[in-house]
Design a protein with these regions (language model features):
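Acidic, Ser/Thr/Pro-enriched low-complexity segments and adjacent helix/loop capping patches
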Residues: 1-118
Length: 118
């Protein structure tokens, strides 16, 4: 089943990242939602809020997955890539794991296809 996304999309130039993400994270925190950060179609991270604290941030770069528990660490990772990012909010009850798993599955399929072609 497709996941129903009600997005908050914020585009930021470098230098605007901190205030924009701060705003997005506050919206997510008060609404009891999770935030998925997408950079040019790749899922960069998912932040799940419980009791007004960031429970986890899963940052996906290529095939590596990193746990980050600090918003500033996440911002520095994002700023290493493209300056334009989008922030999507999900209801916490939505199946966020499915989003992440499907992203990994798609990457794995593409990698496998490339290996076979070589």
């Amino acid at each position: 089943a497709p996941i129903n996304v009600q997005p908050i999309v914020l585009f930021a130039e470098e230098g605007e990242l901190n205030p924009l993400f701060g705003k997005a994270l506050n919206v997510a925190r008060t609404a009891g939602t999770a935030v998925m950060i997408v950079d040019t179609g790749r899922i960069m991270g998912v932040i799940v809020f419980k009791d007004s604290k960031a429970e986890k941030v899963r940052v996906i770069r290529g095939f590596r997955e990193e746990e980050v528990d600090d918003v500033n660490a996440l911002l520095s990772i994002l700023s290493e890539g493209r300056a334009k990012v989008a922030v999507y909010t999900f209801d916490v009850n939505e199946i966020i794991e499915e989003v992440i798993d499907s992203a990994f599955a798609a990457k794995a399929v593409r990698r496998d296809k490339k290996v076979r072609e070589e």
